[in-house]
Amino acid sequence: MKSSSFTAPGKALLCGEYAVLRGAPAVCVALNCRAQVTVSKRTERVSIVSTVGFAEGSWRFKIIDGSVAWLDRPPEGVKSLLDAVCNNAPLTSCRPAALTIDTLTFFSPIDKKKLGLGSSSATTVALVAALQKQSFDIESIWANAKMVHKALQDGRGSGVDIATSCFGGLITYKSCDTAPPTKTTWPTGLYYQFFYSGTEADTTKAIDRAAGVSKKS
């Protein structure tokens, strides 16, 4: 059966990670780990989403009047993501489909923990690209993915990771920007290396701590 695959890269914030929340610029680079979403039509009357990497498994659902009606009980991360995409991005079709979301490259091969390289944003962008109603247009994908991201984050976060996953490369970004981010050239002779600490971080809690510090200052 014919299928289509869509991928989006992870990211690493080089500077401005929390200052960007207050309107300062951030510099972010796309990485070669990618989230992949594969879509294929189903002859059955229900859709199914399968995940590889995060919360591995398969769960059935239907799209009714633009909303997800779950027939199984997926993990909250899977449920909230698909719900947010269906509620905030115009869907290309409500016909039954099989979705496979693969984020395996965002997890440590040693202890299976998340590496903190933007898997959630990369998955959001790839899923929006796979399901949105418009033709494959990067700016419409960005606009819809930002809406999904805001819904998932309760309006918090800068959106720099969404922008990086959409446009790739090395970018300079401000959270107040409505135009696409500025592409930046990597300096000649400058090299970088990332190291995995072995400890996961909660992005939402980190944003809340940063907000608390800025209020005190």
At which residue positions do the language-model features occur?
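C-terminal nucleotide
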Residues: 1-15, 19-20, 28-29, 34-93, ...
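DPxDG-like acidic metal-binding loop motif
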Residues: 115-137
